[in-house]
Regions:
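C-terminal regulatory/oligomerization modules of transcriptional regulators
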Residues: 1-18, 141-168
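N-terminal leader segment of winged-helix/HTH proteins
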Residues: 1-50
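DNA-binding alpha-helical recognition surfaces that contact promoter or target DNA
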Residues: 86
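Generic structural concept
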Residues: 30-33, 60, 64-67, 114, ...
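Amphipathic, non-membrane alpha-helical segments in soluble helical-bundle scaffolds
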Residues: 19-30, 81, 121, 143-146
Length: 168
C-alpha cells in the first residue's frame, strides 16, 4: 500500500509510510529512554547505590567537572524534567552535589560535584566505556551507525524544539 496518503487535522496530506515510520521512531525513542534508565539503575544497584534514581545519576554524569546553575542544566538539554529543583536538592542532601554563589551574579547558585559525586560520575563513565567497547562485537552497532543515528536524532530534537518554540 505504498503511496497511500492520509489527511491530518490541519488538512495536510501525510504519506502513510512516513506516518508509520514516525510513530515507530516515537515509540523507539521512548523505549530507549526507559531502557537507558534501567541500565543505569542496574549499574547503581550492583554498586550499592540504592540512594539514587537513574535520573539523578544521569544528572550527576552531565554535571561533570563543570559548575552549572539549575537553569543552565535545563537550557543546555542536560536535564529536561520538570522537577530539576527537587532532584538537585536531593543530590545536595545526599552529598553528591555542593553549591555556592556565582562570582559574577550573587543571586545565582552554582552547582558542582562533591568527591562522592565525582566518584559516581567515574563509575558511570566506566560503564559507558564498557558499553562503547562492546557495542560493535556484541551489539553489531558500528561507529558509522552511531554517526548516522546521532545526526537523525539531532534533527528530530531540533524539530521538536521548533514545534514548541515556534508553536508549529
Amino acid at each position: 500500500m505504498a503511496g497511500q496518503t492520509q489527511q491530518n487535522s490541519v488538512g495536510e496530506l501525510v504519506e502513510e509510510s512516513s506516518l508509520s515510520e514516525y510513530r515507530r521512531a516515537l515509540s523507539l525513542v521512548e523505549r530507549l529512554h526507559r531502557q537507558l534508565l534501567d541500565v543505569v539503575k542496574d549499574d547503581l544497584d550492583r554498586a550499592g547505590h540504592d540512594d539514587l534514581t537513574p535520573v539523578q545519576a544521569l544528572l550527576i554524569f552531565n554535571i561533570g567537572d563543570a559548575e552549572w546553575s539549575a537553569g543552565e542544566l535545563k537550557s543546555r538539554g542536560f536535564y529536561l524534567g520538570s522537577n530539576v529543583s527537587y532532584n538537585l536538592k536531593k543530590l545536595h542532601e545526599l552529598g553528591y552535589v555542593e553549591s555556592g554563589k556565582s562570582l559574577h551574579d550573587k543571586r545565582q547558585i552554582r552547582l558542582r560535584l562533591t568527591q562522592a559525586g565525582s566518584d559516581l560520575r567515574r563509575q558511570l563513565d566506566t560503564m559507558f566505556q564498557r558499553h562503547a567497547a562492546t557495542l560493535s562485537p556484541v551489539g553489531g552497532v558500528e561507529s558509522p551507525d552511531l554517526v548516522s543515528s546521532n545526526k537523525t536524532l539531532t534533527r528530530l530534537e531540533r524539530f521538536w524544539a521548533d514545534q514548541i518554540r515556534f508553536r508549529l
